[in-house]
Amino acid sequence: MDLHATPDPLTIAEGVAEFVVLAELSTALSERLGEWSTDGADPDSSATMASLAARLDEHSTWWTGRIPESVLLEGERTAASGSGQLAEVPGLLDVAASDRRAAVEPVLDRLVAYLVALAERLSPLGDAPALRTIRLVLADLEDRPR
């Protein structure tokens, strides 16, 4: 196994799957962190959670904008919904209120690592809009809790 080998570029169908999963994940994380920001269980982290929730909600919109609406890709969109390597991530946030901030850190770190790896599979020309979205999301998460 060549550790320095370049991964195969994404097909259109694979891109659809990636963007569906990222949109759904961003929505799920936004909803959870938004709930945390207003439930009063951890006042010290509520402002951070509200900020992250708003950003993740916007990221979901950006990912959704990357999903082609062609009827030819309906099967790929449907199959991708609720699946993927990131599908179990929201479950990692099933923690006590006092552990919320600590739980968010590795989840966002994992998302960032996933996006960096995904960017390596995208073409600088054909996938320029997706690469731009990844760069925007990464920049937006630069000040995430660590």
Regions found by a protein language model. Give the residues of each.
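Leu/Val/Ala/Ile-rich N-terminal alpha-helices, chiefly Sec-type signal peptides and the beginnings
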Residues: M1-S30, G34-D44
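Acidic/His metal-coordination segments adjacent to aromatic residues that form catalytic metal sites
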Residues: D2-V20, T78-V107
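Amphipathic alpha-helical assembly/interaction segments
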Residues: A5-D8, I12-G15, S45-S46, T64, ...
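All-alpha RGS (Regulator of G-protein Signaling) helical domain and cognate RGS-like helical scaffolds
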Residues: F19-L25, D39-P43, R100-V107, L122-G126
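Helix-loop segments that flank and shape redox-cofactor active sites
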Residues: A28-A54, A113-A130
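Conserved alpha-helical segments that form or flank metal/cofactor-binding pockets of metalloenzymes
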Residues: A47-A87
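Amphipathic alpha-helical hairpins/coiled-coils and adjacent low-complexity
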Residues: A102-E105, D109-P145
